[in-house]
Amino acid sequence: VSDRRWRDGAEDRITAVLRDAADRSSASDELAAHIDDWPTRYHFGRARTNLLHPLRLGTGVRILDVGAGSGVNSRWAAEQGASVVAVEGDALRAEAAALRCEDLDVEVRHGSATDVVDDNGFDLVLCIGVLEYAGNEPDRFLAHLAGLVRPGGALVVAIENRFGLAYWLQADEDHLGLPFVGLEGYPPVAATGATATVRTFSRPELAGHLTAAGLTAQRWYQPFPDYKLPTTVLTDRCYDQPDAVDLVDQLVGPPIDRSRMGGRVSADERAIHRQVVGAGHGADMANSFLVVAATDDTALDRRSDGDALAWRFTGDRRRAHLRVRRLTDDGVRRIDRRATHPVDTATGDGRWLVLRSPGGATDDYTPGPNLEQVALDRIRAGDLTGVRVVLAAWSAVADRGAVHRTVSDAEAHPFLSAGSRTVLPGDHLDLGLDNLVGPVDRPDELRFVDDEWEATGGVDRHLVAVRTCWKLAAALVAGGTRHPWPPSTTVDRLADKLCA
């Protein structure tokens, strides 16, 4: 696993950016400003470290990061107080990792993971995006890594699922760049010399390899759209919930990132995912896996979070606005909202937009489909009258809080134009269909959830309506939802039709 098959060609640029950067932290706005293609997104995107939230890290935890790349995960683990040994087989990436982590307790080694020997052992051994390069000896490789885990510790593996939903929907296999080749068993004719031994695994296959390494206690997580830049991480328990179809759909949304997964995906992926979950195959057909494996359940509980149902993360915002929602259910389902990285509590643009509860908050989860899900179902059915009913329900909720007055020039902001005459409360900036839950035919019973932002002085009703329709149109396109308009209709044109 010490060759250089995973280079993306951007290593020199990544190293140069890191060398000049004043802020090399895992959530650095400075580094994120350099994102302009897939390699820079991979190395500098803040979503990379979302994958590690199910792990119990902190002061005194010793970590081995195998195939550390440019040091993204090593950096984040060390920021949590862990002591990290980062091993990277490529010299250029090892140099980048050393720069990324130079001010923290991280020892970067250039070499092969199979050469690592450590008498003290590690509490966690991270094998993220590496096992697929173990060639024809995955059992031997995993056994070596398992031997580096100290008593009470765990091995953490992240890898694509060979039978993941994305691959069935014709997304390109991540390493060979061709559709279906993993499902076909990696035929040699499809590979190059550099990819001839690349292999990913189904859930039963991977579970078997971990068991063969003596790691019989396993806790499985499902990152979406995959483990590289996850916006959601689910647990097996999430799929066992009575409302799993709606719950998983709410948490995941479109299960495939069409902007970077390649291939020719043309199906309604969100509808298919709902069917897969409803049939009981959701966990086995996740696009990728995060597995925490140990010799006993006590070690699993010590090193990973077994209480959560799921984690959902905000998009790649500025550091001050990055949030995680941790969903739990101990008899009452709750959502705990927290910053993913330490920030000042004063967040917003300093003038008109404020992030509510910046220090975090816990709310009860409101069960049931949200109005976006209802609207998508009615659009799939070609029921435009039903879509109008959904939008009318939204309108009724908006009108409850409306105030009729004339907005002055002094109080105007991007979502409150001077001269506006119908003003909604400031938190109604977030009044999208995805944030309304309850019976569509009884608008008075609809509950407004996840009202994260607040605009000073209120927001213009018309602009919020346009934003609501645009978000629904974006959801239609992102998930490939079948609709009665021409397939080439853009998000903006769909939003126009919905607003009308």
Predicted regions and their residues:
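A short glycine-rich, Lys/Arg-flanked "PGG" loop and its adjoining helix->strand segment in the class I
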Residues: D139-A154
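Conserved ATP-binding subdomain of kinase catalytic cores across diverse folds
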Residues: A299-A410
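Short alpha-helix
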Residues: A196-W220
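A short acidic, Gly/Pro-enriched loop at the edge of an enzyme's catalytic core
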Residues: V117-V125
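Conserved SAM-binding loop of SAM-dependent methyltransferases across substrates and taxa
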Residues: S70-G81
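Conserved class I S-adenosyl-L-methionine
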Residues: V157-P179
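N-terminal auxiliary segments of SAM/dcSAM-dependent transferases
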Residues: V1-D23
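Catalytic activation segment of kinase domains across protein kinase-like and atypical kinase folds
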Residues: F415-H483
